[in-house]
Amino acid sequence: MKRLVLLTGLLSVSLAGPLALAQTSTWVPDKAHSEVDFSVLHLSLSNVRGRFGNIGGTITTNDADITKSTVNITIDVTSVDTGVSGRDGDLKSANFFDAAQFPTATFVSTSVEKTANGLTVNGNLTLHGVTKPVTLAVQGPTGPVQGMDHKPHAGFEATTTISRTAFGIASKYPAAMIGDDVKLEIELDVAKQ
């Protein structure tokens, strides 16, 4: 009997250690302070800039090892805003994003790596019904600080460049008219749940 109690006690202690170290925190984007900005070359002359302002999803951080964290972000494609309503309507149409058929884009991480300047987050971006691997260069997390909602908030900035034609977006337009490279800048203010 003493042996069983001792074995049970040792098993409890040996399992409690790793479980305590593997605590995670769940963070969600603050929609008022998070966005995905994009820029693309127009007629090889100037950049057209815009943003998606309705960002959702979760970031689950491993408190002991950030490289074991996961990212699952959803972008409402219908929230596209370039400051020109006619262009925004065209971007939502089948000519570009086809938001009626593909109203959301998602990014799901596959790995997180520490770098000298922050993090590299690898994952799969699904946009316009096409999924491609994407690598984000991430600065952060910053904070946490207490937000107006009395929850801890942290910040992340991420950048990447994608090919619009790889995602089947506006494939009929040559690169001389609309650049193929689209620069993305992601600003996330996330609140701990």
Regions found by a protein language model. Give the residues of each.
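Bacterial N-terminal signal peptides that target proteins for export
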Residues: M1-T8
